């Protein structure tokens, strides 16, 4: 996520083309031609010993002979010379370099050289980049592109060229167009951090084939998506496609889970990609999900309506006030409804009247206007009428409007007019609805991320006991644990299992059954047969000694016949669970090669494929995220309530999933967990059969997770000067209500010192931003005092680091009635220790000149205090890890 050098790459002031040429088909010629044609304002310096000048620009024979150091260099020579040229550029002090072609065996040396000179690399095997606002075309593409607000990042040169050609035909603009190539250094996450802060970029589109660091990607994407919509198209969904792309990009459901968790939106194919470009380029943000449709024909409106229904969209309901206004504005016989059918003879004036009335209405959140070719109402005239209505109406700038002018030839001019007016336009009713639902789903994803999680009823977690059990199993040489061995681990996390007994043979199985009572379940115990059902290794409802004896002997005989090499470690005997009216579920945890542990929920089966039969989520889970996983499984028919007499307890299942998530986060030894079946009966959940795969683990246990979990190790009990004990801990999403109550007990004066303005009310979004933080990017510590009656926040301190992890901005706020207890100092000392341990170099903050308490505290803790009376601020700075 480093931003070092990206300014020089994306906003260079000078460029050197290494290997510039006058031969038309050479890379050096194409790069020089495009740079000069793009209108770049800075110097472009061709470097070649073969020519005195290239395309009329004085050439320099070597890198060393350049009159000054370029911000950006482009290597256009034979790949064999890459390393020596990169070394020369580093010695010259060049900050960034685009490598157009290279061989994988060069990569380690290239990366080492770049790191030595603190140089950033784009590529290798990159098409280059275009930055129209800088007049920069440092690419092979001969297609000029217009200035726009959409940034496009691609891992494929072929897809990049396709999008460029498509956008040129439609005169669509971009803020940046970047082809990453093999991402040896600069990667998607670096660019997302840059574009999130770029004023020329309002939306981002990604084409991805693989990830080098899932955690960095999810962190950067989540941060950027809070302010700008980001759409993703990901290829390589099938193993065959991954093989073709030479990329192991993991399970496709894992990508869906990561994209949703980061607040992004995924589009599935090229057709949707083109619609997404149109949407991101022109559509205004949605304030809600209700759609109003107006059309000059019932058929296209019906097609739109069908697609909306298939995608679970919402149709707006018209108020009587709006209906009356439409009746007065439109001819007699027009049925006032949604969709509004203006009839096939609707003139441009009818369109304008209808739109003017609808612009006065608050009944909908987006307006779709459809036009079918008609002799009575030419498409161009109707388009001009719509544009005119939006231009002159006071609400025209604020209403989200989509247009669908059907047809091809007859609608070309109308689509051009809409594009010039900044209105999204699509060729089909279905495509328009697809685009609308993209933005609806994006809005839902963002809303989901900002919801305040509910607190679970109670969570059991005896981490030390679980670790001890797993470690002992590893020391004993076990790689797989069966139900009776896993049960103590699950119970340590509050997951209920059935009591299980081990029998060496059929005779002992009969003896156990006689002791515990019938009916019983009998299960094979073999480390070599993971799926017992493959050999009928599970027998249920055995009611007599004879049935148990017969089932046990038959089970062992079947294994000896079908799996002669399999080891048989006896049998498991369980009391038969009451399955009447219950539902059988399956919870699986697997490790994805890209995103790490995945939690999967479904109903199971012998040939169980997560891609088809499970809803998938990334740990860690809170109650809200677990609830969304359950709802997703139900909605997508991964869980069906066909046999349950009692409805599924969604809250109870969500809590169990949170417990599974906590187990996986806390215990990195667990490689795989399969609870199948999980018996759900009302609010009771029982793991009937469990398999756990384990392996020794060393190092940072959090490194395997795509999302950093809550850092329990940072919790600390502190005694204040008045003797009260409080817990210093990282902030949690569940803290939102407590944080609001805390702010209510801070005086307006103290809030003004903290926020530099008068804030009358903190919205849910404000509080969500404060509590739902990414622990990889920022940290907030709260001081919490707990009594029998309540738990309350007494103070907060936070630090937000820059993407390069060099500087962090800090703030601290203590409840106004608790000043003088040393709370602010203790909180700030904890924050200083944390930022120092994470390698930051400086901790910076600002306050007001009359905030004497903060200034005094800063001086005591070693901050440099710079009072800037002209600006009305005091800058505070503390060096942390310098020298």
Per-region residue spans from a language model:
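A short, sequence-level motif marking secondary-structure junctions
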Residues: 543-545, 693, 731-734
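Long, contiguous binding/interaction regions
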Residues: 698-883
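Catalytic-core regions of core metabolic enzymes
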Residues: 1-689, 697
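Acidic, glycine-enriched active-site microenvironments
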Residues: 674, 693, 824, 828
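Short, basic/aromatic-enriched C-terminal tail that caps enzymatic domains
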Residues: 691-693, 878
């Amino acid at each position: 996520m480093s931003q070092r050098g990206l300014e020089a790459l994306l906003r260079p002031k000078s460029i050197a083309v290494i290997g510039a040429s006058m031969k038309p088909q050479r890379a050096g010629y194409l790069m020089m031609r495009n740079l000069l044609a793009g209108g770049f304002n800075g110097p472009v310096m061709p470097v070649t010993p073969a020519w005195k000048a290239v395309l009329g620009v004085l050439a320099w024979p070597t890198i060393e002979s350049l009159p000054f150091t370029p911000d950006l260099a482009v290597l256009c020579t034979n790949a064999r010379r890459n390393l020596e040229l990169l070394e020369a550029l580093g010695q010259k002090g060049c900050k960034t370099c685009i490598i157009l072609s290279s061989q994988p065996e060069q990569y380690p040396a290239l990366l080492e050289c770049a790191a030595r000179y603190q140089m950033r690399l784009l590529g290798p095997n990159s098409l280059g980049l275009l930055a129209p606002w800088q007049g920069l075309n440092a690419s092979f593409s001969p297609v000029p592109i217009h200035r726009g607000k959409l940034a496009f990042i691609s891992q494929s040169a072929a897809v990049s060229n396709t999008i460029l050609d498509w956008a040129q035909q439609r005169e669509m603009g971009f803020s940046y167009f970047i082809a990453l190539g093999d991402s040896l250094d600069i990667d998607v996450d670096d660019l997302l951090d840059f574009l999130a802060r770029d004023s020329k970029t309002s939306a981002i589109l990604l084409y991805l084939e693989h990830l080098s660091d899932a955690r960095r990607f999810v962190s950067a994407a989540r941060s950027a998506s809070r302010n700008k919509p980001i759409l993703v198209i990901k290829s390589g969904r099938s193993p065959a496609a991954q093989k073709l792309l030479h990329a192991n990009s993991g399970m496709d459901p894992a990508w869906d889970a990561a994209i949703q968790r980061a607040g992004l939106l995924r589009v599935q194919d090229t057709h949707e990609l083109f619609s997404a470009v149109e949407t991101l380029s022109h559509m205004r943000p949605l304030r809600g999900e209700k759609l109003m449709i107006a059309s000059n024909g019932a058929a296209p409106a019906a097609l739109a309506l069908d697609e909306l229904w298939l995608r679970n969209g919402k149709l707006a309901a018209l108020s009587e006030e709006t209906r009356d206004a439409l009746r007065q504005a439109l001819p007699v016989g027009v049925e006032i409804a949604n969709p509004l059918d203006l009839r096939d003879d609707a003139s441009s004036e009818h369109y304008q009247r209808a739109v003017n009335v609808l612009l006065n209405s608050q009944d909908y959140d987006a307006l779709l206007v459809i036009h079918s070719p008609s002799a009575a109402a030419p498409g161009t005239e109707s388009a001009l009428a719509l544009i005119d209505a939006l231009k002159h109406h006071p609400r025209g700038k604020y209403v989200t409007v989509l247009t669908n002018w059907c047809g091809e030839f007859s609608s070309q001019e109308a689509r051009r007019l809409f594009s010039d007016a900044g209105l999204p336009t699509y060729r089909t009713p279905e495509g328009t609805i697809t685009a609308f639902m993209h933005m609806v789903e994006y809005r839902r994803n963002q809303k989901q991320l900002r919801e305040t999680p509910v607190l679970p009823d109670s969570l059991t977690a005896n981490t030390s006991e679980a670790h001890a059990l797993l470690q002992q199993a590893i020391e004993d040489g076990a790689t797989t644990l069966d139900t009776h061995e896993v049960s103590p681990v699950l119970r340590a996390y509050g997951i209920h299992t059935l009591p299980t007994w081990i029998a060496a043979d059929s005779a002992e199985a009969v003896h156990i059954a006689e002791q515990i009572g019938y009916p019983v379940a009998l299960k094979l115990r073999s480390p070599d047969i993971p799926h017992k059902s493959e050999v009928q290794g599970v027998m249920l409802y055995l009611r007599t000694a004879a049935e148990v004896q017969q089932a046990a002997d038959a089970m062992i005989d079947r294994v000896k016949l079908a799996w002669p090499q399999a080891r048989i470690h006896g049998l498991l005997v369980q009391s038969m669970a009451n399955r009447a009216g219950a539902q059988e579920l399956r919870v699986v945890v697997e490790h994805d090669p890209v995103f790490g542990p995945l939690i999967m929920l479904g109903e199971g089966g012998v040939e169980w494929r997560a891609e088809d039969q499970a809803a998938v989520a990334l740990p860690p889970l809170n109650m809200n995220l677990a609830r969304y996983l359950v709802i997703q499984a139900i909605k997508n028919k991964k869980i069906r309530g066909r046999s349950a007499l009692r409805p599924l307890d969604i809250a109870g299942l969500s809590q169990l999933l949170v417990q599974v998530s906590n187990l996986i986060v806390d215990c990195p030894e667990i490689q795989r967990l399969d609870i199948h079946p999980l018996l759900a009966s009302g609010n009771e959940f029982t793991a009937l059969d469990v398999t756990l795969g384990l392996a020794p683990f060393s190092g940072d246990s959090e490194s395997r997770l795509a999302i950093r979990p809550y850092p329990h190790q940072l919790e600390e009990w502190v005694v204040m000067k008045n003797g009260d004990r409080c817990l210093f801990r990282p902030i949690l999403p569940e803290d939102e209500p407590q944080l609001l109550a805390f702010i209510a007990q801070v005086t307006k004066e103290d809030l003004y010192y903290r926020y530099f303005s008068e804030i009358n009310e903190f919205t849910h979004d404000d509080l969500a931003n404060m509590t739902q933080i990414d622990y990889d990017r920022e940290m907030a510590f709260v001081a919490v005092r707990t009594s029998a009656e309540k738990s309350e926040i007494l103070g907060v301190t936070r630090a937000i680091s820059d993407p390069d992890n060099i500087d962090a901005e800090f703030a601290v706020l203590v409840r106004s009635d608790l000043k003088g207890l040393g709370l602010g100092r203790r909180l700030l000392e904890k924050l200083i220790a944390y930022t120092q341990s994470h390698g930051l170099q400086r901790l910076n903050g600002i306050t007001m000149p009359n905030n004497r308490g903060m200034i005094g505290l800063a001086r005591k803790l070693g901050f440099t205090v710079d009072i800037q009376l002209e600006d009305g601020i005091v800058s505070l700075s503390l060096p942390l890890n310098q020298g």
